[in-house]
């Protein structure tokens, strides 16, 4: 059974650049390296179309940009000019009056072969310039993905960095009463839409993680009452056990090149970090202690590994070279630290911290300095990075009879967003950008 298939898109970059194209000194930009920034007022018009699809596309674009915390879509009721032809230069004064510093116009049309063509233009209203213009062709059922791609293009043009909207998240969906909760592996778009289940059994599943090429997921399952790490092919639905070891295997994660899986393997009462070469199926032991070493995460260059260990009496974060040498502790604050995950940018490690009766999500530099707590509460856990390294997703369990939910937060700690899902949700893992 085909669970997931890649969506083919034809992209014509700069196909819509016109005589209004902007020079390099156009003023609309956001410097996201300055910490907390003021969101950019941006007017996003309903894309022209013969049906309601154009307005739906622009609504998704607006939601993506607003959720980033870097853009503030202007209320449509304030619009003065009604865009009747997105190919024509807008009346910039009408947009400056309502302080829309950027303007997005576009259209969605249906081709004779049934495909959709979505096109957009991004304008700097104060400089009176077009900043970007692109068009995309795809099947009608993929219209939401086209909207995410357009949002990424706008984000990149204004901030100078890659966006993260055309991505997916694999997670554990949870349903049923607390005493008999069913946990399934599921996948969705990063905004919580297009949820699909990847497994359908009563066996507990935990810690799903994407491969670098986005085509595989590794996860832990208690199938047959035996905790093991599995590898699932998203396109075919085929899966296999990653190593038939006598003890528990858990906390799997791919190496950046996709050639290995790093995981924790329990043998003789101890849990240590191992790697398995997916081609030769040979394993290499990286740690050898009488403690519990788990939750390994590679640096983006594959040269180092962060992991958690209780070898010092309580859970702390350690860093080592990829061959297991040079192991050193990097967390020294109050409380215990767990679930370390290296930023795609290589500059930070995100973590879960338990201290003072609260579970917090935070980040630190890779040497342990500069620790910052982004959010705290009854139970926050399991951070995962957006592919641009600017946003984290995690799950939160509030006190009471409810269940866990997914949230996102940026590195300022101010832009926390609930990711709505049909069921309770935990253990998120963000994909790289899609092709």
From Swiss-Prot:
Biological processes, Gene Ontology terms: cell division; protein import
InterPro entries found in the cross-reference section: 6-blade_b-propeller_TolB-like, PD40, Tol-Pal_TolB, TolB_N
Major localisation: periplasm
Keywords: Cell cycle, Cell division, Periplasm, Signal
Signal peptide interval: 1-26
Origin: domain of life: Bacteria
Localization per Swiss-Prot or TrEMBL: Periplasm
PANTHER family associated with the record: PROTEIN TOLB, PROTEIN TOLB HOMOLOG
Assembly description: The Tol-Pal system is composed of five core proteins: the inner membrane proteins TolA, TolQ and TolR, the periplasmic protein TolB and the outer membrane protein Pal. They form a network linking the inner and outer membranes and the peptidoglycan layer.
NCBIfam families (alphabetical): propeller_TolB
Annotated function: Part of the Tol-Pal system, which plays a role in outer membrane invagination during cell division and is important for maintaining outer membrane integrity.
Protein name, as recorded: Tol-Pal system protein TolB
């Amino acid at each position: 059974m085909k669970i997931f298939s890649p969506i083919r898109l034809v992209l014509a970059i700069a196909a819509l650049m016109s005589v209004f194209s902007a020079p390099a000194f156009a003023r609309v930009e956001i410097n996201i390296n300055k910490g907390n920034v003021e969101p950019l007022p941006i007017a996003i018009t309903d894309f022209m179309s013969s049906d309601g699809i154009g307005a739906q596309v622009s609504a998704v674009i607006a939601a993506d940009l607003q959720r980033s915390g870097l853009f503030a879509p202007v209320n449509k009721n304030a619009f003065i000019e009604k865009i009747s032809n997105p190919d024509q230069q807008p009346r910039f004064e009408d947009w400056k009056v309502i302080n829309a510093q950027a303007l997005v116009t576009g259209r969605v049309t249906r081709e004779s072969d049934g495909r959709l063509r979505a096109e957009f233009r991004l304008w700097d209203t104060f400089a009176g310039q077009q900043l970007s213009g692109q068009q995309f062709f795809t099947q009608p059922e993929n219209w939401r993905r086209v909207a995410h791609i357009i949002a990424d293009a706008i984000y990149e043009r204004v901030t100078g960095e890659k966006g993260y909207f055309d991505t997916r998240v694999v997670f554990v969906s949870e349903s049923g009463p607390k005493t008999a909760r069913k946990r399934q592996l599921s996948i969705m778009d990063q905004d919580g839409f297009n949820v699909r289940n990847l497994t359908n059994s009563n066996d507990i599943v935990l810690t799903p993680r994407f491969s670098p090429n986005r085509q595989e997921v590794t996860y832990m399952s208690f199938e047959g009452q035996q905790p093991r790490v599995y590898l699932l092919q998203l396109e075919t639905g085929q899966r296999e056990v990653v190593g038939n070891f006598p003890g528990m295997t858990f906390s799997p994660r791919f190496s950046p090149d996709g050639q290995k899986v790093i995981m924790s393997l329990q043998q003789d009462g101890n849990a240590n970090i191992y790697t398995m070469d997916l081609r030769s199926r040979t394993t290499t032991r990286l740690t050898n202690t009488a403690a519990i070493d788990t939750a390994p995460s590679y640096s983006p260059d594959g040269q180092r590994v962060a992991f958690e260990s209780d070898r010092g009496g309580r859970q702390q974060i350690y860093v080592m070279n990829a061959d297991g040498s040079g192991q050193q502790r990097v967390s020294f604050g109050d409380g215990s630290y767990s679930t370390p995950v290296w930023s795609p940018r290589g500059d930070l490690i995100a973590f879960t911290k338990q201290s003072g009766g609260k579970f917090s999500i935070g980040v630190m530099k890779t040497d342990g300095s500069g620790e910052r707590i982004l959010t705290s509460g009854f139970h926050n856990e399991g951070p995962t990075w957006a592919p641009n390294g600017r946003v984290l997703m995690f799950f939160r369990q509030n006190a009471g009879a409810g269940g866990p939910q997914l949230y996102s937060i940026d590195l300022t700690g101010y832009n926390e967003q609930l990711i709505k899902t049909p069921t309770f949700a935990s253990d998120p893992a963000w994909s790289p950008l899609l092709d």
